Amino acid sequence: MGEIAQPAFFESKLKQIVYCGVCTLPPEYCEFGGTAKKCEEWLKDNHEETYQRLYSEEALSSNLSTLSVSVRERAAKDAAKKEAKAALAEARDAERKAAAKVQIKRVERNKRKHVTVITGLEVHGLENKKVAKELGKKFATGSSVTKSPAGVEEITVQGDVSEDVQEWLLEVYGKELPESNIELVEDKKKKSSS
């Protein structure tokens, strides 16, 4: 009998893919987003060799030499439009965040029972479910995310912990949530006439 040939094992090298820290796309695709300038700056600071490959003078001139004059002009106009749109959207988002209030409401349920309701966290980039779980652990109470009658998600924490919640939010999420945007409200339940 003949010898059976053993299959040769090849060591495959894993490719390291670089993703942009601004738009989360590979750097080759950053030009198609609206944040091309910011992406270029990020790439220059963090991955110099990839930056040289994509944005060096010779790389840019070789790419431009294949385009006609009218296509170059159109590409420049499109890039300017995208940049302006991205800047406008970013400004609008920052303005919306600055104006958005986080409301911490103390609501009376029964005679001496209270719940604390927190709304408006999602505007500042916080996940309601995650924050609700952290609040439940921190204050050792029940905490859940519910939809209000208006259709907005709110966090309901059992007990009168509104001032403690305010302090905790500033301590943990102080960077995302400025103190001027937190509002304490006391809401008493109306007595039903029977």
Curated annotation (Swiss-Prot):
Chief place where the protein resides: cytoplasm
Keyword line: Cytoplasm, Ribonucleoprotein, Ribosomal protein
Gene3D superfamilies: SUI1-like domain
GO molecular function, one term: translation initiation factor activity
Annotated localization: Cytoplasm
Pfam family of the protein (one): DENR_N
GO BP term, pick one: formation of translation preinitiation complex
InterPro entries for this protein: DENR/SUI1_TIF, DENR_C, DENR_N, SUI1, SUI1_dom_sf
GO cellular component: cytoplasm; ribonucleoprotein complex; ribosome
SUPFAM superfamilies in the cross-refs: eIF1-like
Domain SUI1: residue ranges: 102-173
Subunit structure: Interacts with the 40S ribosomal subunit.
Family stated for the protein in its record: Belongs to the DENR family.
Free-text comment on this protein's domains from its UniProt entry: The SUI1 domain may be involved in RNA binding.
Entry protein name: Translation machinery-associated protein 22
Organism: Aspergillus clavatus (strain ATCC 1007 / CBS 513.65 / DSM 816 / NCTC 3887 / NRRL 1 / QM 1276 / 107)
